[in-house]
Swiss-Prot record:
It comes from Shewanella pealeana (strain ATCC 700345 / ANG-SQ1). Pyruvate binds at T45, I203. The record marks T44, Y107 as: Part of a proton relay during catalysis. This is 4-hydroxy-tetrahydrodipicolinate synthase. InterPro entries: Aldolase_TIM, DapA, DapA-like, Schiff_base-form_aldolases_AS, Schiff_base-form_aldolases_CS. It is found in: Cytoplasm.
Amino acid sequence: MIYGSIVALVTPMNSDGTVDYKSLESLVEYHIAQGTDAIVAVGTTGESATLPAKEHIAVVEQTVKFAAGRIPIIGGNGANATAEAVELTKGLSNVGVAAMLGVTPYYNKPTPKGLIAHYTAVAASTDVPQILYNVPGRTAVDMRPETVAQLVGIKNIIGVKEATGDLSRVKELRNLCGDDFLLYSGDDATAREFLSLGGNGVISVANNIVPKQFKAMCDAALSGDVSAALSAEESIKELFSVLFCEANPIPVKWAVHRMGLISNGTIRLPLTELSTEFHGLLLEAMKNARIEVK
């Protein structure tokens, strides 16, 4: 099982918009060295919405190859058409991912019945463990705990990434889904409390730029060391809001580039690079977190 501090990795790109595999390899090595517990490849932060299926699968496969068994890789397999999600799932099933992360279908706003049918179909297309992903702020559909509970009986659905920031859902999900169902926070600002309330891990945006500090916070929270968790959070919590001054992954990709971890900050349309007005704000937050900028 996958626990702890998990990075929602950015997908580095060359100036022409193609994937920068050299920088991708460097990012994988960086997170292994920093102690990150797992990597999500081509999720929301990895620009899954603008990578066609063939390229999407190729990026996940290369991430697995670069990791070479040293860190678990979770492949994003979400789409707003069930047939497309099944296609991605089948394509990712043979590349060596430890699990897959599937966001709720976005824009078309399925009912709970539709969500259950969608995830049932996706899970049936593979033996690889599946993690559900609820982020209504981006998808316009909220998968409530009672809907999640109806999917627990499917053997390869192992957990959910809950990104509403509503901490009351931790207890509700645990009560409805049982102790073995994995609960991951998808909201950096409430991640420490989420873990303290019984969560198992955090799939994080900020982890891209403060992996060591983020892991320290997660480890302390999971072990019940409230003081150490608060101390680790204090040094980086400013980033939890500043990294969302524009739509994710715009700010974090800019920050990763400023750290010299990727060759440039190219991001695919319709997203554009961080607006100049926010450069100072993000640089100040990075400075306060003692991040070296090149």
